[in-house]
Amino acid sequence: MEQILKNLTLDFFGKGKHKISPEKFFKIENGILLDVRSKEEAGSISIKMEYHFNVESINIPINEIPDRIDEIPKEKSVAVFCPANVRSAIVYAYLLSKGFSDVRIVEGGYSALTEALKPDKVLKVSQNEK
């Protein structure tokens, strides 16, 4: 954990190396959207990647991450999501401390995610996959 903290320099944050836009993430091959919201939040607004065949989504509430970490594949690009990026930042650091190397925070919260999942964009993706 010490080394992770030492790497979190102004250069690191200034270049945005810790975050990724939803649009960029959805173009990645073999990605996983890790939704760290509570079960209640995920039940209210669910995020499914049915038409983004290169990306799967999984909801593991932040308080369950330590017990369910084996459900998160280390070989995939992991994008951590929560509405305000507070929980995402905590899980981001935790995953790095557990040996995950390709982890980012989805920037922009709900608004950026819903923008990337608007009907015209989902239609485009679904037509490209057929």
Regions found by a protein language model. Name each.
Residues I45-N63:
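A short alpha/beta connector and helix-capping loop motif
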Residues S46-E50, K74, A93-S97, K118-K121:
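Short, glycine/charged-enriched secondary-structure capping and boundary segments
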